[in-house]
Structure formats: structure tokens, C-alpha cells
Amino acid sequence: MAKVSKRVAANKAKIERTKFYPIDEALGLVKGCASAKFDESIDVAVQLGIDAKKSDQVVRGSVVLPAGTGKSVRVAVFAQGDKAEAAKAAGADIVGMEDLAEQVKAGNLNFDVVIASPDTMRIVGTLGQILGPRGLMPNPKVGTVTPDVAQAVKNAKAGQVQFRVDKAGIIHATIGRRSFEDTALKSNLAALLDALVKAKPATSKGVYLRKIAVSSTMGVGVRVEQASLSA
């Protein structure tokens, strides 16, 4: 633990916690502080100008990151007939109906995303207590309950990320890996922020994108100067 503590302390010493850095410098600091042996994810936290306690200000959605996430995603699909065949052709790893539901009930959750055709919700609805706590429950707001299951599979495989504001009014998302070029990370961040702006609640007043910070899996957060994002 001592080595970890020293590394964290050294990383923090490189960064002024109250300073807002241009995006290029912020990413450089984050990558420089990411010293884990694995390819750490690069994450972003966005403080929104909303009241997360109000039901009409819950920000939720999804976006396909143009440069992907750097992660291989396993997709399960509830569909039948032509839609099941289309899902398989699109690259779904598991496709089924009652048989897939039984796998879920048995605890076989070897997938990262669950997609469902609307006509299968009578089955999927019974799995809420299992899928819900794991963030796997299909939802039309994030495009995982849809008649076009094939496109949803393609989106998931292409690097779609889901986002939902937490109780503190913050969105947390992954925008890539340490190994990504800065241009890829910036394009992914831009796509995420664009999706957040489009999802802005009508009742939200004042500054909407209040603060943005980037970090690596094992690293510290670096605040981003928003003006540099449009430069």
C-alpha cells in the first residue's frame, strides 16, 4: 500500500486542484499520471446545472463515441423471428427469449449490454430485480428498447455509452483509454458533451455545463477549461 500512496501523492503534486487546464494540457497530465500496468480508461465527470432531486431534471441518454471506447462489448438481445436473425447478423453475442431469461435468472450474466425488442418486454420486465441493480435493464431512453435491434447492436459494438446523472448532479462516463490519441479522446468528449446539451431539461436554468474534469482509472481528476474545448 505504501507504494500506491506514494504514487498517488506524487500524482497529486503535479496538479493544481483548483486550476482549470486547457484540454490538451489536461489530457497530458492525466496520461502522465496514469502509471498502472494496464491500459487505464480515461473518464470524464461533468457537473450539470440541474436539481437532480427533481424528476423532470433527470438527465439520461446514450451516445455513440466516434472513436469507440477501446473496450470489447458483449451484447445480449431479447428478440424472436426476423429480429432475432437481424440481431445475430449485426454481431449480437447472445440472442433469445425465455431461454435467455432463464440464463439471467440462473446468474449467467456474461454480457455488458442488454437490448430488447418492445414485444419482448413481457419477459424482460420480470428480470428487473436482476438486471436493474447492475445497470443492464433495457430502457427506451437510452435506445436499448427498440424495434431496430440490429442497429442497437451495431451502436453498442461501435462504442455507445450510456449516461445518467447521479444524485449530486454529475454525469460520469468513459471516453476512451490511455492508449488513445488525444484527437480521439477529444472527439469522444465533444460527442458526449453534445449529447448532454441535447438532453438538457427544459426546466434547467442558468449555466448548464458547470464543470468538467478528466481522470484515469487510478489517477486524480484534472479540471478542464471549457473555452479550450471549442478552440
Swiss-Prot record:
Gene Ontology annotations for the cellular component aspect, listed alphabetically: cytosolic large ribosomal subunit
GO molecular function ontology, one term from the record: rRNA binding
Entry's Gene Ontology BP terms: regulation of translation; translation
CDD domains membership: Ribosomal_L1
UniProt keyword Metal-binding, yes or no: no
Signal peptide location: none
InterPro entries per the UniProt record, alphabetical: Ribosom_uL1_bac-type, Ribosomal_uL1, Ribosomal_uL1-like, Ribosomal_uL1/biogenesis, Ribosomal_uL1_3-a/b-sand, Ribosomal_uL1_CS
PROSITE patterns tied to this protein: RIBOSOMAL_L1
Source domain of life: Bacteria
Keywords noted in UniProt: Repressor, Ribonucleoprotein, Ribosomal protein, RNA-binding, rRNA-binding, Translation regulation, tRNA-binding
Subunit-level organization: Part of the 50S ribosomal subunit.
Similarity-based family: Belongs to the universal ribosomal protein uL1 family.
Function of the protein: Binds directly to 23S rRNA. The L1 stalk is quite mobile in the ribosome, and is involved in E site tRNA release. Protein L1 is also a translational repressor protein, it controls the translation of the L11 operon by binding to its mRNA.
Identification of the protein by name: Large ribosomal subunit protein uL1
Lineage of the organism: Bacteria, Pseudomonadati, Pseudomonadota, Betaproteobacteria, Burkholderiales
Gene (UniProt): rplA
